[in-house]
Amino acid sequence: RDSTAIEARESITPKDKAKVVPAKGKNKPGRPKKGDVRPAPEPSPLERQRGQTLEQMLFELDTACATGTKKNAQGYKISWKGYKLHPDTACCGVPNSAVLTGANVHDSRVALPLTRISAQRVDACYELMDAAYCSTVIREEIEVAGRVPLIDHNPRKGDKREFAPHEAQRYKTRSGAERCNARLKDEFGARHVQVRGHAKVMCHLMLGVVALCADQFTRLLV
């Protein structure tokens, strides 16, 4: 599982300034006074997804054209204007499912929706993801579904936890997701999107995904 940048030839969708978000009251630092009751912290987007249906998860994902930033394979930050495609690829190189979001959506927000979509189509034993998906919520939800999560640990200023030898060997197959993204861009038109709007861009990319699936199945049969 991985995401790839999709550059678009359209303007960034402006946010509605009419929506005024009320300021959150800040709690005073330190222990609360006796009798004071502090409100419970709001759940994170990932925690909120636990109690949602697949349709609710997908509805909350931003699908408008936006600006995105990520690190490339060399460790340098790159920025682009457009979208982000999140394909879920099997170990044989065939995409099981895909979700298109705005470029500003973090990869981890799409992990649980992809897990549920792919579970309806294939029986998987493992789910392999890079450090962008490192989250206790994602790990627990995958384990509840009866699969093994192999997610590269993000130390976040702590000690990095390495894979066990057998897990590291299995994790090597995640490179198939990167090859799938590269083939979509180099061979099946994902690098040259001429249409505008989420629906048309998704249609353009899905035609490439269908062609990639057919080509990959042919390679597996030969």
Stretch-by-stretch model annotation:
Residues 30, 36, 126, 131-199:
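Helix-centered, glycine/charged polyanion-binding patches within enzymatic domains
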Residues 1-131, 136-144:
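Polybasic low-complexity intrinsically disordered regions
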Residues 199-222:
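Charge-patterned, long linear interaction tracts outside catalytic cores
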Residues 110, 176, 180, 203-206, ...:
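Catalytic-loop motifs flanking and including active-site residues across diverse enzymes
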Residues 121, 180-183, 187-191, 213, ...:
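Hydrophobic alpha-helical segments
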Residues 3, 77, 97, 102, ...:
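Generic secondary-structure boundary/loop-capping signal
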Residues 12-24, 187-202, 206:
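Compositionally biased, low-complexity linear motifs
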